[in-house]
């Protein structure tokens, strides 16, 4: 099981119903170019073509990390000195709600409150998750619907101050910027209407295994990535169905990122958690 490439043609060897299956990458995955440095030594011969195995991301359970383009302190200084883009028009008043105050059974694993994230740096002073009230209530409804199937929601991030988005953008190498928001436009996280999340098993309390890890900047993160196991794809779909039923849409390059339908109605925010 894995991902392979031959002359720009990429395929996945995946498990389906206990059998191995070869599937080509869909058109929406072709924007993710293959770095020659990811080609491993092993190969797969399919229809007389030799495909070399790709190392698209870290091993399961390992956090994806980048080498930032500048030191953390420089990134922070520049971001705090900058201002969010000016916006015109009428917006709804900000009403950020802390998710755990609505349902204590929702779990948190706020990666940016520690160093277990793609930049290996701490951005939040405490592990908290906020969303605009309608988005927060919709998230709780999705969580409660999932409990009937033996799962709950594990939150990685919600409202994200704009200055943090600016730091992510400035730190990320150009080829990987499809995975981070452009601060000149602001992000849905900045508006309090985007949530990063996964499932956890109610019986064990442990997060489930998805086709990629959180914040992995590779094609495995795409919501329509065809690889992985049947169970991983089924769990990804279970999460997506629950979130879409409550008015969320999955982000095109991240299976864990969901935007609430009314995100355009809220202003970009840059307040720290302590200021909320």
What are these regions (language model features)?
Residues 1-10, 243-247, 254, 259:
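K/E-rich alpha-helical interaction surfaces of small helical-bundle regulatory domains
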Residues 1-78:
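Peripheral terminal and inter-domain segments
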Residues 59-156, 171-253, 262-276:
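Extracytoplasmic cell-surface/polysaccharide-interacting catalytic and binding patches
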Residues 23, 41-43, 47, 112, ...:
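Generic detector of bulky aromatic hydrophobic side chains
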Residues 162-168, 258-265:
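Beta-rich nucleic-acid/ligand-interaction surfaces
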